[in-house]
C-alpha cells in the first residue's frame, strides 16, 4: 500500500476471480498498476477536455452526431449491466466492463476520433459542443461507477470537478439514463463501422511494418464493402 496506494490493492481484489485461490506478487501488482493507469488517465483526459465546460454548452440528443449517440447507447447498455451486477455484488464483472469501456470504446476509438474536433473546431461548433456534452456524461457516470472500486481516485477526480469537499462522490447514486439513449439501429451501424475500421487499422499496421508508410496519415485506404 505504501508503494502503490490502496486503490491498486482494491483493483487487484475486484480483478481477481475470488471464487478461486487468489494470487498476488510483483508481476500481478505491476499489471494492476497498468490497469489502474487506464482508469486514471481516462478521468484525467475527460477533466482536461471539459475545462471551462458549463451546462449552457450542452447539446440536445437529437442535434448530436451519430458517433455521440453511439457513445450514449454504450452508456445506456452498460448502465443496465452495472446496476444488475451491483445488486449481485459482482464487482469483478463491473471492473471488466469498465476496463473494456475505457480501453476499447474510449481510448482506442472515441477519444482518438474526436481529438481533432476538440483541438481544431470552433468552440461554439455543434460537433465540439456535442463531444463535450457526451464527455460530461462519461465523467459523471464513470466517477459514480468507479467509486466503490477506486474510492480515492474517484473522489479525487470528482473533487477536481466540483471543488466542494461536502459534495462527495460517495454520496451520489447512479443517475438514471434517459430512455432515448438506447438506440439499437445506431449500435448495429457503429458495430459494423468498428469492424471495418479494425480491418483498415490492421492493414495500416502491416504497411508500417513493411516500411511502406511511416504514419497512418500517410495512407489513403480504399474500402470495399
Predicted segment positions?
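Membrane-interfacial loop-to-helix junctions in multi-pass inner-membrane proteins
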Residues: 24-32, 90, 127-135
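Conserved structural-core and active-site-/substrate-pathway-adjacent residues in large, well-folded domains
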Residues: 5, 39, 105-106, 146, ...
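Catalytic adenosine-cofactor/nucleotide-binding cores of aminoacyl-tRNA synthetases and other
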Residues: 1-64, 162-165, 212-213
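Generic structural concept
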Residues: 33-36, 40, 72, 76, ...
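Acidic, turn-prone loop/beta-hairpin segments
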Residues: 53-83, 111-203, 207-224
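Short alpha-helical scaffolding segments that buttress acidic/His motifs in well-ordered protein cores
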Residues: 8-16, 43-46, 98-102, 110, ...
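Secretory-pathway/luminal and periplasmic proteins that interact with or process carbohydrate-rich
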Residues: 20-22, 107-111
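Short helix-adjacent coil turns
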Residues: 86-93
Amino acid at each position: 500500500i505504501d508503494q502503490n496506494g490502496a486503490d491498486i490493492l482494491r483493483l487487484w481484489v475486484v480483478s481477481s476471480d475470488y471464487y478461486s485461490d487468489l494470487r498476488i506478487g510483483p508481476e500481478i501488482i505491476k499489471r494492476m498498476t497498468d490497469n489502474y493507469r487506464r482508469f486514471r488517465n481516462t478521468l484525467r483526459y475527460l477533466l482536461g477536455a471539459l475545462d471551462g465546460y458549463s451546462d449552457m454548452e450542452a447539446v440536445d440528443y437529437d442535434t448530436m452526431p451519430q458517433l455521440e449517440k453511439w457513445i450514449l447507447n454504450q452508456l445506456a447498455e452498460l448502465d443496465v449491466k452495472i446496476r444488475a451486477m451491483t445488486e449481485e455484488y459482482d464487482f469483478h464483472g463491473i471492473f471488466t466492463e469498465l476496463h473494456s469501456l475505457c480501453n476499447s470504446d474510449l481510448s482506442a476509438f472515441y477519444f482518438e476520433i474526436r481529438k481533432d474536433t476538440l483541438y481544431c473546431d470552433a468552440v461554439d461548433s455543434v460537433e465540439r459542443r456535442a463531444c463535450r456534452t457526451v464527455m460530461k456524461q462519461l465523467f459523471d457516470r464513470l466517477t459514480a461507477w468507479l467509486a466503490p472500486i477506486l474510492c480515492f481516485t474517484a473522489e479525487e477526480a470528482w473533487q477536481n470537478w466540483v471543488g466542494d469537499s461536502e459534495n462527495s462522490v460517495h454520496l451520489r447514486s447512479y443517475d438514471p439514463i434517459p430512455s432515448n439513449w438506447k438506440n439499437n439501429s445506431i449500435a448495429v451501424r457503429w458495430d459494423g463501422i468498428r469492424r471495418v475500421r479494425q480491418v483498415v487499422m490492421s492493414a495500416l499496421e502491416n504497411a508500417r511494418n513493411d516500411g511502406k508508410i511511416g504514419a497512418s496519415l500517410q495512407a489513403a485506404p480504399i474500402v470495399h464493402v
